[in-house]
UniProtKB/Swiss-Prot annotation:
Phosphoenolpyruvate binds at residues 22, 96, 124, 171, 344, 386, 411. PROSITE patterns: EPSP_SYNTHASE_1 (PS00104), EPSP_SYNTHASE_2 (PS00885). The gene is aroA. It comes from the Bacteria. This is 3-phosphoshikimate 1-carboxyvinyltransferase.
Length: 427
């Protein structure tokens, strides 16, 4: 297996222009495809997940052109539901941001489509979304294991009264919200259980509004969506930088700054993961906010005990930042780590122990006590981009770290290690 050994880093200092947000990129692509008119998306993320969405849209007959660097996409909208040409099978890799919204969107009309993906995708639950779509009339079959992809979709979704379980993934609610305006009937969506990752729903609602559709949101417990609507292109749309990707650089600044400044997000960002900066500040770092940047300056870091339900992806970065904090850090209410690209709770606990940390892994929490000195270890990445990027922070100690399968960062940030090196001074 390919590996990358990062030598100890003495100091980080500088600015990083963030790649486009994965969450925003794939939502914007799908809405542009469903909309009337031509949309020009700029600062689009070039990554595996976005390529899977683009390939699917192409197979569904959507016309688009990409710039040479794949960060600008001119897309001609369909002016309504996507139409599958005959029997179509779409391979979506391990891209949850493509699988879940497309599963809902392709239930409009009378298409017949199969959605499949990598082996890990077949372990990521989709049953709650399927149950909700069936309540709205959708005809869906599981082709292998009940409640998991691959799926055969035969259209039929018309709207109506729907319940969705919000406790596993906010992507299920996102998928329903984006599809419901195009259904013939009005849709009332009631959320069961605690809604995880609520800020990601705000991203969805913000983008829907940009494309001309507004809905009634009753305290995130009930959403009322008028049927028979159309999305309309906003013309040009700038994809803001990826706030989850910002977390690694901001954490590096907190640990070994200097000051690290990330541009492309700021105090006005729609992404909930900008709240990661507040967590670093609580730990002892100094944060400066601008409209289009966040900067982090080193501070003496102290352990925290926090509910991380609102920023589950960025919370992973706190788990490795905890290696540099005084005391025992506890991250709570993170059950949905278990249904991401890998079982992230298990993976994080396993790899933190390799570098010498004392770790308690609960069903929905992790407790981390750093060692007096970090150990050099080969870090398994579980084909999970965030595991690779989180554990790069170990190099901010006086100990090297070896990252196995470093190219797994292609899911969201193909040149991550080059960008980290650019702001780093070797020890």
């Amino acid at each position: 297996m390919e590996s990358l050994t990062l030598q100890p880093i003495a100091r980080v200092d500088g600015a990083i222009n963030l790649p486009g947000s994965k969450s925003v990129s794939n939502r914007a692509l799908l809405l542009a495809a469903l909309a009337c008119g031509k949309t020009v998306l700029t600062n689009l993320l070039d990554s595996d997940d976005v390529r899977h969405m683009l390939n699917a849209l192409s197979a569904l007959g959507i016309d688009y052109t990409l710039s040479a660097d794949r960060t600008r996409c001119d897309i001609i909208g369909n002016g309504g539901a996507l139409r599958a040409p005959g029997d179509l099978e779409l391979f979506l890799g391990n891209a949850g941001t493509a699988m879940r919204p497309l599963a809902a969107a392709l239930c409009l009309g009378q298409n017949e489509t199969v959605l499949t993906g990598e082996p890990r995708m077949k372990e990521r639950p989709i049953g709650h979304l399927v149950d909700s779509l069936r309540q709205g009339g959708a005809n869906i079959d599981y082709l292998e294991q009940e409640n998991y992809p691959p799926l055969r979709l035969r259209g039929g979704f018309t709207g109506g009264d729907i319940e969705v379980d919000g406790s596993v993934s906010s992507q299920f609610l996102t998928a329903l919200l984006m599809t419901a305006p195009l259904a013939p009937k009005d849709t009332i969506i009631r959320v069961k259980g605690e809604l995880v990752s609520k800020p990601y729903i705000d991203i969805t609602l913000n983008l829907m509004k940009t494309f001309g559709v507004e809905i009634m949101n009753h305290h995130y417990q009930q959403f009322v969506v008028k049927g028979g609507q159309q999305y309309h292109s906003p013309g040009r749309y700038l994809v803001e930088g990826d706030a989850s990707s910002a977390s690694y650089f901001l954490a590096a600044g907190a640990i070994k700054g200097g000051t690290v400044k990330v541009t492309g997000i700021g105090r006005k960002s729609m992404q909930g993961d900008i709240r990661f900066a507040d967590v670093l500040e609580k730990m002892g770092a100094t944060i400066t906010w601008g409209d289009d940047f966040i900067a982090c300056t080193r501070g003496e870091l102290h352990a925290i005990d926090m509910d991380m339900n609102h920023i589950p992806d960025a919370a992973m970065t706190i788990a490795t930042t905890a290696l540099f904090a005084k005391g025992t850090t506890t991250l709570r209410n993170i059950y949905n780590w278990r249904v991401k690209e890998t079982d992230r709770l298990f993976a994080m606990a396993t790899e933190l122990r390799k570098v010498g940390a004392e770790v308690e892994e609960g069903d929905d929490y992790i407790r981390i006590t750093p060692p007096a000195k970090l150990h050099h270890a080969d870090i398994g990445t579980y084909n999970d981009h965030r595991m690779a990027m989180c554990f790069s922070l170990v190099a901010l100690s006086d100990t090297p770290v070896t990252i196995l399968d470093p190219k797994c960062t292609a899911k969201t940030f193909p040149d991550y290690f080059e960008q980290l090196a650019r702001i780093s001074t070797p020890a």
